[in-house]
Amino acid sequence: MNYENLDKFMNFLKENVKIVRVGVVFDALKHDKRFKEFVGVKKLRKSAIYNYSQRGIILGKGSLVVYDPDEVRRIADNFFKDSIRS
């Protein structure tokens, strides 16, 4: 597992989101092939995402309160678009 790439994504997520639960992030990304290749795993574990949370809630600096996995997928798409540009 490439923790540097996971750190990059989680920091991007924290910049855009105020509150999101770990389960929502996990449900959104567990079948995303781009994300798993980016992090370098075959099967994503919830514990890898849980390490970035406080009691199951990821707190960030953004303004969005996310309850839907589709919103997390949209944020991930923006992350990959930005990473392709740079």
UniProtKB/Swiss-Prot annotation:
Protein name: Uncharacterized protein ORF86
Organism of derivation: Acidianus bottle-shaped virus (isolate Italy/Pozzuoli)
